[in-house]
């Protein structure tokens, strides 16, 4: 049985990973482990990739799993607008590495202002929307889209994309 270690105990990340594995019909054992990303509490731009990779790599080390998976949400200033997205990073014991990025969405200035004051996106969203711990539920994306797209939905697609070098037997071991 293949084991995959998720570098987080966030219930949204666990649920999204389970859903992606179900869609892929992969009967893998999922281990969720609390891993520090090694980057700032609110990563910006490239830090998001570093944090996701650190989570994946350290999840393997902590659990001796076959695959490590890290999910890190971040923000970045693009053409004067702040966008939010997530990076999903996958590493196997054999050293195969791949990543994928979620859809991006712009953040309103009220949330950006709080982020620039040192708040994390989830914390800033909770302040603006008067919610509690939204990062373990619908997330900023759910609050902004009236839950048409929630945080779990945002993560499922990049998890599937990041894992393709492992589950796609046609390209497995040929491109990576």
Swiss-Prot record:
Keywords: Hydrolase, Magnesium, Manganese, Metal-binding, Nucleotide metabolism, Nucleotide-binding. Pfam families: NTPase_I-T. Gene3D superfamilies: 3.90.950.10. It comes from the Archaea. GO terms for biological process: nucleotide metabolic process; thiamine metabolic process. GO terms for molecular function: ITPase activity; metal ion binding; nucleotide binding; ribonucleoside triphosphate phosphatase activity. Binds 1 divalent metal cation per subunit; can use either Mg(2+) or Mn(2+). Disulfide bonds: none annotated. It catalyses: XTP + H2O = XDP + phosphate + H(+); ITP + H2O = IDP + phosphate + H(+). Its EC number is 3.6.1.73. Its cofactor is Mg(2+); Mn(2+). Mg(2+) binds at residue 36. Belongs to the YjjX NTPase family. Phosphatase that hydrolyzes non-canonical purine nucleotides such as XTP and ITP to their respective diphosphate derivatives. Probably excludes non-canonical purines from DNA/RNA precursor pool, thus preventing their incorporation into DNA/RNA and avoiding chromosomal lesions. Homodimer. This is Probable inosine/xanthosine triphosphatase. The lineage of its organism: Archaea, Thermoproteota, Thermoprotei, Sulfolobales, Sulfolobaceae.
């Amino acid at each position: 049985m293949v084991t995959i270690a998720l570098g987080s105990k966030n219930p949204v990340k666990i649920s999204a990973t389970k859903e992606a594995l179900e869609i892929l019909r992969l009967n893998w054992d999922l281990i969720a482990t609390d891993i520090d990303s090694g980057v700032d509490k609110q990563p910006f731009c490239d830090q998001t990739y570093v944090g996701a990779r650190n989570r994946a790599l350290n999840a393997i080390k902590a659990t001796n799993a076959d695959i490590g998976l890290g999910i890190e949400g971040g923000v970045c200033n693009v053409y004067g607008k702040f966008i939010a997205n997530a990076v999903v990073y996958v590493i196997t014991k054999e050293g195969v590495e791949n990543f994928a990025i979620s859809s991006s969405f712009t953040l309103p200035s009220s949330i950006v202002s709080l982020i620039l004051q040192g708040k994390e996106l989830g914390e800033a969203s909770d302040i603006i929307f008067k919610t509690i711990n939204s990062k373990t539920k619908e997330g900023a994306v759910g609050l902004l889209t009236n839950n048409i797209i929630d945080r779990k939905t945002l993560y499922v697609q990049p998890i599937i994309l990041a894992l393709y070098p492992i589950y796609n037997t046609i390209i497995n071991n040929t491109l990576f």
